[in-house]
Amino acid sequence: MKMENFEYELKMAIEHILETNYPRKAFWHFDDLIDDLKSGIKAGDDAVVIKNMVINMEGPYPLKLGAKTALIHTACDVVAMGAEPKFALNAIQAKNEDEIKLAVDGLRKQSIGLNIPIIGGNTQTVEELKSCISVAVFGELIDENLIIKDGGAKDGDLLIMLGDPVEGDVGERIYKAKKKFDTYLEILENGIKINACKDASRGGWLGNLLEMLIKAKKGAEIKSLPYPRATRYLGTYIIAVPEEEYEKVVDIALKNKCPVVLFGRILEKPKLIIGTKEYISENKMLELIKKFPYKY
């Protein structure tokens, strides 16, 4: 990857994580109205946690893409926070009955493959509107005292990438996602300590790693490139794990035939180093931290 291309991707990654600043500030105090809220708009995490329930909503996706991945992607964030998905709702806007069938058949395949029943939602046909799909997934923490947040990385943690890129036809996507979900939940069920986890979705591994670092007020040293295009959608998990727990993670990943790649380490000082080059200085990272209204 040429340096100028990577620096362009870095700029795009920063712009991506800035997109949610206004809505987060606008809805900031709504958290205070909800009893038993453990993680909401102030945390800005992948999903909302109320008591032991974890909820995430995604979309709208273009209809054909959503038919292949909407439920998969929405469930991904629920699992990342340490929850098992239990059921889902969907909303479909289609232009005609053929599009409704395309959307429903694709969502049904995802639902059966992941064992996440779709139990309700809304379907409409308005020709003037673009065809799209949105999904909400409701999950339950596997341990009500354990929430894996995306901003919990600690100095010295190893950075790993877990899972295959979620791409291909709907069957391939289901297979890859389920293997990743099962492996990750098994890691947690075995008491292996995970300090932070985030789905490398829109924004790629770079954008999502930057958000993790900003929230944790930490830096990272990247020693290998899990995927050369840094802002590509992957659907893998970026995980910060204590070094002494890493081999246990590898053991479970090997048993489940789930890819795991070690690609860096968390630093106490907030900066981003890739190879020998410092791409984000400590001063620049501190400026980014000040711009984001996250509260853990």
Curated annotation (Swiss-Prot):
What GO MF terms are annotated?
Answer: thiamine-phosphate kinase activity
Gene Ontology terms: biological process: thiamine biosynthetic process
Pfam families documented for this protein:
AIRS, AIRS_C
Q: Which InterPro entries match?
A: PurM-like_C_dom, PurM-like_C_sf, PurM-like_N, PurM-like_N_sf, ThiL-like, UCP036541_AIR
Q: Which family does it belong to?
A: To Synechocystis PCC 6803 sll0787 and M.jannaschii MJ0640.
* Name recorded for this polypeptide: Uncharacterized protein MJ0799
The protein's organism comes out as Methanocaldococcus jannaschii (strain ATCC 43067 / DSM 2661 / JAL-1 / JCM 10045 / NBRC 100440)
